[in-house]
């Protein structure tokens, strides 16, 4: 059973629309992206490639394992590009879905610009890092380049903490799905002496 934000987001995503999904941690952003990417690449976008962009190598490895599990059900191959293995190139060449950091994908495009030509769908996870002074510029330039070269490519931006979701959605020409729903109640606590009091948020 889908969480409410997932149920709201999936029809938009599966229809091929660009989407900015701004919902709390653990409310199901990644599953929406995984289902959309696997479904569309196995159907409407057959023959195209999906790119799943994350900010950190550790997160790339995690998403790679998750996407492999879902994508294997529809016969799609997933590749990982984080620059740590000499054997990566063969899996990159054969992949239907490529999981990578923005820096690695930017480097790959500089070395082989033709990689951009078959992109059908892009997921940008932890999208609030667009505002990070060290990582943001690379991601922004990368997405601008993809949007310029592949105008029809679908873009899904995911974030739990982005502060200006409406403005970003407008920049991406994307549907904005914004919710504060959580699967569990969030509490804050105050400790005065030995007295601990919890308050729901």
Regions found by a protein language model. Name each.
Residues 2-192:
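Conserved P-loop/Walker A NTP-binding site and adjacent catalytic elements of P-loop NTPases
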């Amino acid at each position: 059973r889908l969480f409410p934000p997932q149920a709201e987001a999936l029809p938009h995503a599966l229809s091929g629309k660009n989407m900015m999904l701004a919902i709390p941690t653990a409310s199901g952003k990644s599953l929406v992206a995984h289902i959309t990417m696997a479904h569309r690449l196995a159907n409407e976008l057959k023959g195209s490639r999906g790119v799943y962009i994350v900010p950190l190598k550790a997160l790339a490895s995690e998403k790679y394992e998750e996407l492999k599990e879902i994508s294997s059900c529809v016969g799609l191959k997933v590749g990982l590009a984080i620059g740590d293995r000499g054997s990566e190139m063969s899996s990159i060449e054969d992949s239907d879905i490529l999981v990578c950091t923005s820096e690695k994908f930017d480097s790959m495009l500089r070395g082989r610009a033709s990689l951009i030509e078959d992109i059908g769908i892009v997921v940008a996870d932890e999208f609030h890092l667009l505002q990070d002074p060290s990582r943001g510029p690379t991601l922004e330039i990368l997405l601008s380049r993809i949007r310029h070269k592949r105008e029809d490519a679908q873009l899904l931006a995911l974030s739990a903490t982005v502060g200006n979701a409406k403005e970003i959605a407008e920049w991406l020409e994307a549907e904005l799905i914004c919710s504060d729903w959580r699967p569990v109640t969030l509490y804050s606590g105050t400790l005065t002496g030995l007295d601990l009091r919890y308050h729901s948020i």
